[in-house]
Amino acid sequence: MTAVEPATKKKRISKKNKSAWRKTDIQDVEQFLEDQRQEERVGTFADKQDEDLFVVDSSLPKTKATVLSVKQKRKLNAKKPMRSYQALENTSKVQDPIAKRNHVRQKKNGRNIELEVCNPTKPRHRQANSDRAQYYVKLEQRLADKKNKKLDVEKDIWQEVDFRDEIPGLKDEKGWISRELALHTAGNIGKKVVKTHASLHHKTTKAKKFELPHPGMSYNPAPEDHQALIDQVVEREEGIIKKEQHLKRVTTSMFSKVTPEERDRRRLNEMSQGMDEEEGSELDEDVQTNGKKKEDDDEKPYHTINAPVENKKKSKQARRNELKQKELARQTELKRKLKQQTADLIRIKSIRHELDDEEEDLNDLKKRRKQRAEKAKFEPKRLGRHKFEEPDLDVNLPEDIAGNLRNVKTESSLLKDRFHTLQRNNMLPTTKLVSRKKSKVKRFERNSHKEPGVSYNDLKERRRAAAAAAKATANIKI
């Protein structure tokens, strides 16, 4: 069978004369006859088997190229050998003439950890291997439990459960125990309903919630307690005064105070130092040099500013001497190092003592830093801009002690003390009193209110005197 070609519209040609018959298209007849002859030679399609006519396509179907992400590309590149090692690869096609090589392995210095693990010889190595094996067993068990963990699908997540039903005594029918009280009680008996972070239960300060005042602050204190309080206040004030004196010594006292006129005069003298002497000498030199300048210019030979450069090469003898000097310096340095080593061997005991002292100092420093860090845990934290400072102690002098509550002198405020306690316990940030800025308003008196011949300041003084007189009169009546 032949493939059927699609029919095409033939072009009509005039065949009126016999000579025009040669224009007739006989291509289809010739093609049919050629197909007949071909079938007679090789046979028709019906006579052949399917295996001769068709071929089974066993090739894999072509898939579209998948676009890899950056992470997948990074993983594929990690499996490839590094480019820095490509220079070490053998790219030659010539075979190695030496089929087998005897590699000489040098003995490594120090411990061979791999050998100690594989062939333990000491008890601590065996103990380490057993601990390592137990750790891996526990790790595999933990990973297996995590993999085989089943989710609790039987639990209804939308079901509302009251925690008071599980804890006896927290739910009553009359409603005396509220939900907030039950929640607080459950947390205190070890059955917390709301899980909180562990850091909330760590103590951050050693300060007490309510600290009793010093016994010397009593309205009728014992003489010893009152004296101890005074000593404590005096010691604190001495520290403050000492600090102020130090700051004054290193700042104000280091510089002398002068008036602006004196300062300008000193600066002028300093900047004009040596100018008067130079002016007189310069005039004399100019007169002398001007006459000799022309004569010197004629006598001096011409020369360039930069000296000519000569490329002088070292001789063999100079190079040999230079090498000898370098070798001599090297030998001298070796002798010095050998001498230093010999001296160190002689004083090895003193070096050992120095190392011990240095190690002891280092341990003391570590201990102090650890103590300082432990102490800083419980100090008042800086929760805001300002650092907490202990308030001043209230103290009465011996003549101010009343002895009874009726004549006691008020020194402090309970609200202030409580406020400082909250700041000390890291509950409130430390603040400072900020006064509101009072705007400076310039006042003018109207012309209609002015008295002739009296200024504004005089009127102000009169009003102030009148107010003081009225106040004095009111006090006398009382």
Curated annotation (Swiss-Prot):
Database matches in InterPro entries: Nop53/GLTSCR2 (IPR011687)
* Region of interest: Disordered: 90-110, 253-323, 440-459
Q: Does the keyword Nucleus apply?
A: yes
| Record keywords | Nucleus, Ribosome biogenesis
The record's GO molecular-function terms, alphabetically, read:
5S rRNA binding
Gene Ontology BP, a term: ribosomal large subunit assembly
Record-level GO cellular component terms: nucleolus; nucleoplasm
Family that this chain belongs to = Belongs to the NOP53 family.
Query: What is known about what this protein does?
Result: May play a role in ribosome biogenesis, being required for integration of the 5S RNP into the ribosomal large subunit.
Q: What is this protein called?
A: Ribosome biogenesis protein NOP53
Question: Which organism is the protein's source?
Answer: Drosophila melanogaster
